[in-house]
Structures are given as C-alpha cells and as structure tokens.
C-alpha cells in the first residue's frame, strides 16, 4: 500500500491481482481491489466484469447486480452480463428480474446450455412461489 492508501502497482497490476484472488477463492479481497481498479479506470469492461464476478462470489448480490447492470448499459447485447445479472438477481430473491435477464442471455446464446438451465431453475422457483 502507498501512503495514500492505494494498492501498490498499476491498475493493470490490480486487475491481475484481483483475478488471482478470485481464482484462489478470496472474492471479498478481490472485490475490494477490483473496486479500486474500477474507480481508476471506469471505462474498463474487463475490470467491471471481474468486479461483478467477485461481488457475486462474495455474496454481495446487490452490488453484483449494479455492476452487471452497468455492463449491460454499456453493451445491451452482452449475454454474459445478462446471465450474471440474472444469477445475482436470483440469489437476491428478485426472481422476475432474474427470469427476464436469464431469458435474454439464453435467447442471445442458445448454444450456452447453462444459460437455459439457470432460466429453467428460476422459472421453477417462480412457479413454486405463489407471491
């Protein structure tokens, strides 16, 4: 850490260290570092996607939803961002939102079978929930 409280190295270094922390199953630490990187490089889709994944893996579903939503606002045809938003919304109990974005991801990429599988799971949960 520097005297100003920022991590040592460049934003590129922070990004790669964040990915390493994710791979080592330290999502909270990864999210903290990647949030710094995203602040420094707000236009980087790679950093934002990694941040969203870290937030999701850390169980910070509302934050992950916000990050995936930012990705979608920059590229509405990003199937992975729709998938990520759908998964995060599902974990947050937002089943209608989850179904909407999982359906979009599955329609964009019918060849990615886990998109359709996640959509079926959310639809089954919605059917079991009378509210």
Task: List the predicted regions and their residue ranges.
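Structural signature of tandem alpha-helical TPR/SEL1-like repeats
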Residues: 2, 24-36, 58-70, 92-104, ...
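TPR-adjacent "capping" and linker segments in tetratricopeptide-repeat scaffold/adaptor proteins
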Residues: 1-13, 129-130
